Amino acid sequence: MQDEQDKYLKNIDFYEILSLVSKYVSNPDTVNLLSNQKILKTKESLEKIFSFVSLIRMLFESCKGYPNSFINSLKYPISLLLKENSRVSIENLRDIIVFLDEVLRINLFLHKNSDIKHLNVQILSDLLFLNPELKNLLNELKEHIDVDALELKSGVVKEYDSIEFEIKNLNRRVENQIKKIISLNAEYLTSNFVCYKSNKYTLALKSNFKGKIKGNIISISSSGETFYIEPNDIVNANNRLNYLSLEKERIILKILRNLSAKVHSNIVLLDNLYNNFLYYDSLKARAIYGIKTKGVFPEISNVLNIFDAHHPLLKDSKAITFTPAENRVVIITGPNAGGKTVTLKTIGLLSAMFQFGIPIVVGESSTFKIFDNIFIDIGDEQSISNSLSTFSSHMSNISYILKHTTKDSLVIFDEFCSGTDIDQGQALAISILEYLININSYVLISTHYNALKYFAYTHEGVVNASMRMDLETMQPNYNLIFSIPGESYAFNVASKALIDRSIVIRANEIYSSQKTEINEILEKLIEKEKDLLLIKESMDKKLIQIELQEKELENFYQDLLLREKNIETKLLNEQNEFLKNSRKVLENLVREIKEGNINVAKNKAFISDLEKNVDLKTNKVNSLNNKRNVVADFKIGDKVRIVNSNAKGKIVGISKKKITVNVGAFNVSVSSSEISLENFKEKKENGKNFNFSIDYNKENLLSFTIDIRGMRSVDALDFLNKKIDNIILNGINKFEIIHGKGEGHLMREVHNLLKELKFIRKYYFAHPSDGGSGKTIVEI
């Protein structure tokens, strides 16, 4: 069954896609893994692979430094080290180090980006979890092996270091000694360089001076012109070097055996991690392929609806849309070379890629169905000479499909039951189609048979679809129209191919004379379908125009709102600027009053005139503010501005009728229409906080109660001066000072201050029932 499934996938070029995905793997073993993986057939398994691939893709696209190094295959060393007393080469151990290092880098990268919202990196961390035992193994291997130089590190094994030290010193002495011999006998040598033959230092002596240098002949050149002589003076040194080299090799093998044993003790963990890495690598390759092709994962559904699909192997391919709605059988008709086969292959290939977890190039609103198998019979290889053998081959393939298809299978037939007698082929096609409808399979077919077009009109769940074609160029535009069967355009194609016009005319006459009643009915149905399609297209265009007009009106309305807002903002700024300037005038007046330079009565008259203008401006500001803050949803903690006084504060209480605003040391009760939301930074004041209550009412004067009990005289007078300034600026003409009775010291200090202020009209103690001598009433 699997071999057959592989054959069907090959027919739609699925393995070419797999080859493209394989270019992005980090390990050669991943290529084999991808080749052996099968299409997934459950929603759970698909959603799992979608989440993995999407996560890796997002990490690649949004985070810098994603680890993606090439890793050599570990299949051989792992299989060898599964056996006891096995030993691997230093190259194999180097590959294990590189692999574990890469996994460690990936883990560190995932940990670094674990706080990114909407990215569940933990599922990757769990997949590539680096066990502490493997971390220890990595550290030990790195302690012994220099990965770059591919040799053992010095300073780890004393026996190895001792041999290495002696070899280096002896090599140096031999090289110096042989260089002296060369300098004394240069005329007899074919080369002034030291030659290394059979693991020995030698000299390249000319054959006619064979006896000039005493020593052993180690080798002779192929021409016989050069003798490679080992001088007697270095024979012992050469022998010693050979011995040391053998000892070094023995020690290296011993170290490698010990390291191999340590890997063997963790081989199960290593093998599991390596297999997990290969799976991860296959996911990563899919993710990178998706980035390169801008592919997506469409929604899993019970319905196959494809929008703006592109064949991934065709350059500049045109978008294909396939929307059969609830129909499970689609009969596609149209001219040869009209795009039927490309459409069928595209749908089959994208379905296979989707179920393999490979991102596909489709519109985001597309939905794909999960099939248990994808069966394909492509009729590409048709010719006069082998039509019978081709037909027999197709029948054999269709026989297998019919035996194994289920209600969850996708069955694709190209040029369904062609290559034989038309009447018999049509009958066979209808019979097979009825069988598949009874099974309730999902079927896509292309055909030229009129009987199948008529079949679609008379059976529920079966729909015609036609490939549109440019009749001038006779080129397909891959626009699939549902409910209307297509025409073959045989006569148009013949004319385009420059067949003699008289032949084409005669063919048309013959065709017209042979029309059956069914053909005529079918043609009438097609014409009616075309008329309905034209009406639908006209209505769609009108609907689009209406939507565009609605959008234009909406944009115009939004533009008007923006203009109105800009005008309001400009006016508000002007009014606020006026209020700001008026405030400055009032501040100057207060200062002059304190200094005694202006008559209070005259000043009040001036303020009265000014207030009329202020009220006019303020009303405009209030009106605009109310307009901009309609039914403001105030809440405790909101920062607001009191529009009549320009004071800023924070809401500390809300009742049905009033809102309490804390302004500095005062609590002000106002209505919601008299405040507006404001953004400002609160100033922190040092020292003790004292509460002051203001009952704000448009119809009455503001009355302030200032409580300075418990304050030192100096602090109280300084604080009182500031608050009296604020009272004057806000146009308040009466306020109360609670100083308490006690010994009367604070009261006397307050009264002395009031005497000095020329704008104070009078002050007196409160009524005994309202505090008596503990409270002073002040009038300005």
From Swiss-Prot:
CDD domains xref list: ABC_MutS2
Residues engaged in binding ATP: G334, P335, N336, A337, G338, G339, K340, T341
Swiss-Prot/TrEMBL keywords: ATP-binding, DNA-binding, Endonuclease, Hydrolase, Nuclease, Nucleotide-binding, RNA-binding, rRNA-binding
UniProt cross-references to Pfam families, sorted A to Z: MSSS, MutS_V, Smr
GO molecular function, one term: mismatched DNA binding
E.C. designation(s): 3.1.-.-, 3.6.4.-
Domain of life assignment: Bacteria
NCBIfam families (UniProt xref): mutS2
Name under which the protein is recorded: Endonuclease MutS2
Organism of provenance: Borreliella burgdorferi (strain ATCC 35210 / DSM 4680 / CIP 102532 / B31) (Borrelia burgdorferi)
Gene expressing this chain: mutS2
